[in-house]
């Protein structure tokens, strides 16, 4: 359903094949949550004990769970332009993005109190962050995707620098 909706909005590349929970279990080589398990406890246990083998469908070169900076920016635009999405959907998406806990990319060098709603992406050798900086002149859309990284830390640092430069240019 989500891929049909994305295609209807004109997204030619963006595809989603699983939710975050499914991807985590896939990463750990587990197809699903065991019946009767507490999902949070099971995810915590898997993350602490599972070997880091990157062969699941999240890493397959099949065009699944992919997007482009252009399409991600178009999606962000839908969140800031009133009337493009139902208000309830827009408000809920922005609320989730404002609570993003990964802070080592776009927000890293922003001054305290600067509002940012963003979504990160990470797999070995790839770092992404796409977000909306809410600045006095108006919202600024920022999308940074880096790949083929020898150092994931260097990729995160580059995106953090982009966040700083965008803030300086538009604040």
Regions found by a protein language model. Give the residues of each.
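Mid-domain, small-residue-enriched loop/turn segments at the edges of structured enzyme/sensor domains
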Residues: 1-76
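Structured C-terminal helix/loop/strand segments within mature extracytoplasmic catalytic/sensor domains
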Residues: 57, 61-171
